[in-house]
Amino acid sequence: MGTNNDYRLKPSFGDSFGTGWRVMGDNFLRLFLVVLVVGILTGPTKMFHMNFSSSDFPHFPWIWHGHMGHEFFNLASLGLLAGFFILLALLYSFLVVPVIKYGSKMIFIQAVRKIKPDFEWLLKGFWENYLNIILANLLVVALVILGFIALIIPGIIIGCRLAFVSYLVMDKKLDPIEAVEQSWKLTRGHGWTIFFMGFVSIFIVIFGLILMIVGVFPATMWISSSFASLYQAVLNEKEKPAELIAAQA
């Protein structure tokens, strides 16, 4: 972490996106590969958004043509099939995807710290810190949903204040409760910065999609690098060495 000063790490909107751009440029191929792999590994959850009808499976054994009440049995069979796929999607979304996404965030932190990104982080969470990752993700999702139910704005506030949970779980090996509490402390005074960065990120992704879709890869890389830069900048601010604090006094 002694090379952090190579980048302009200040917890502001402009500095975070500016540093994120530099980080992306310095590690383009490696971060591109990370984003590509994450997209492939998290993509299966989108495969389960299907619309079934009995006409799609005319020769399957559960199609009860010619039997009394065959329409009911057809619908029931398709319902069970759809339920099975939905269950698979939920299990994959909550037991696999968070590990991959949390690992990718650690890779972006390494890039910000000028450490050679280690691709093993994409899967390392399955044998290291797995339970903390899964529980932290569930806790954050539950808190944000409760906030949105409470009138939307609380959900946005909670989402912004818990933006560092995934970084803290991977970087500091904190448990879910500690990560939530620490993220809340670290983001104090930076909530608006996180909100505006998230808001602008939406338009960056849209612009990337407009560029023949392929632009979404550098857009995602830039956004991820920028948030990792913000996290590191806030961390540096909160963890200043004692001698530096004494010198500034």
Which functions belong to the PLM regions below?
Residues 1-249:
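Hydrophobic alpha-helical membrane segments
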